[in-house]
Structure formats: structure tokens, C-alpha cells
Amino acid sequence: MKILESLAALVVAATLFPASGDACTRAVYRGPDGMTVTGRTMDWKEELHTNLYVFPRGIERRGGNGDNVVRWTSRYGSIGAAGYDIGIADGMNEKGLVANLLFLPESSYERPGDNRPVLGLSIWTQYVLDNFATVDEAVEELRKERFRIDAPDLPGGVRSRLHLAVSDASGDSAIFEYIDGRLRIYHSPAYQVLTNSPAFDKQLAVNAYWKEIGGLVMLPGTNRSSDRFARASFYIDAVEQTADPSVAVATVFSVMRSVSVPFGISTPDKPY
């Protein structure tokens, strides 16, 4: 049942891909009896021409071109949504692990003289889905920093600057960000929400201010990343808590609508 619930959450992600506005929000709903649903918006600035792909176990993969790349064989089957057909932005594997990439302009992956094996940013999500069943497993392995991220520009010349959110069927969650070439990991079931700029530690600080005020008193209402973070953080816990999969998915849809950017709207000086 939990796998079906997570699959429904992936559908939430896929159906929200074609919006516009350079903004994304991810939220994890944790209801009674282990009910877990992960949803996200994809309010990108242009059509991503998203396709869904189903991958079986046992696929041999490479982290990029050349010889000095990460190589692995997928342990788990998965389904993923690919933007521009160049990489999986959102996906879920057969164990209920969900991974979501969101834009973070503060990201920087480079270290001077770094000769570790390469993992392309476009396959980072798939690497996680292929290899791990739980957030704990992903955190334990990724914190070893065995590879370096290669991040070529996206179509249109946009620099690839992304952070990764991972959640599992138990409701656990982790955020992975590269700042100044170093991996930062934030691991807790309490980290249910992720948006864009600023980096996650600063988002938590801003959200702490709004928690003191209280969501029933006032919530910030713009499409800026920190405002969406505060709204999603309040609503994902304030909404009805249910073990009914259909109601839970509908509830996540309602939260996602509250942070979706209207079509064609963006903030020129703060698009993320």
C-alpha cells in the first residue's frame, strides 16, 4: 500500500511539470498509520517536455563520459520524470524511496584539483533511486563523498545549480546541497519542505520566524522561495491527517496548489 501511495505522489509531481515561473516546492505529508505522500511543483520558466520512464533492476550505468566516472548496476526498479529528456528530475523506486531535484542558485560543486570519479548532475537522482531503499542508506553512502558532481549548463544556457530532496516510505527525509564544493546533508523526518534560494539552513531560520507568528495569524503570500517554504511548512502539517490514500493524495494536491506560481508569473530579481 505504501508503494501505491508513493506512486500517487509521483503523479502529483508529474502533472505539475508544465507550469512557468522558475520556482519549485517539495513537501512530504506524514499521516497516521505510516501514510506518507511526497508532492512537488515544477514551476519552471518554460516547457520541460517531460516524459515518464520505467527502469527495471539490473541496468548497468555510468555517471558520465570518459573513463573516470562512477559505474553501478541498478539494485531497484524505478519510475522517473525526465525534463528535456536529459535526466530524471523526480522519481520513485520499488522500495518507496522518492527523490526530487530543485533549483538552488547558491549551489557550487567544484573543488580545485578534484580527481574523484564523476557523477553527472543529470543522473544524480537516478543514482539514488537505483542504489538505496531508505533515506538512512542514502545518507550513509552519500556522506562519504566518493564522487564529484559534473554540472553542465541546461538548455538555454541556464547554469545547472540544483539540490536534492530524498524521502522514503517511513516518512524520513534528507536534503543534499553542495555549497562551495562541499556536500551539506540535513537529515530528519522534520525536514518535510524544500524550495529554492537561499540554502536550506537559511530557509530554516526564516521559517522559524514565521512559526513564532503562527500560520493562522499570518503567512507570507508572494511567490518568493522563502514565502513558499513558510506556507508549505504550515499547511503540510495543518491539513487533515488521514490514512485514506485517496484523501491523502488530494490533500497533498491542495497544499501544492497553495504554493504553485500562477502561469506566466515570476519575480525578475528573485526568480527562484
Stretches with model-predicted labels:
Residues A23-R116, I149:
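A contiguous strand-loop segment
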Residues V135, V139-F176:
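Aromatic- and glycine-enriched pocket-lining scaffold segments that form the walls
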Residues G21-V37, N51, R61-R62, D150-P152, ...:
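C-terminus-biased signal that marks the final domain/tail of proteins
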Residues M1-S6:
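Positively charged n-region of N-terminal signal peptides that target proteins for export
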Residues L7-P18:
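Bacterial N-terminal signal peptides
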Residues E47-L48, S108-E110, A174-E177, R184-H187:
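Short helix/loop capping segments that flank catalytic or ligand/cofactor-binding pockets
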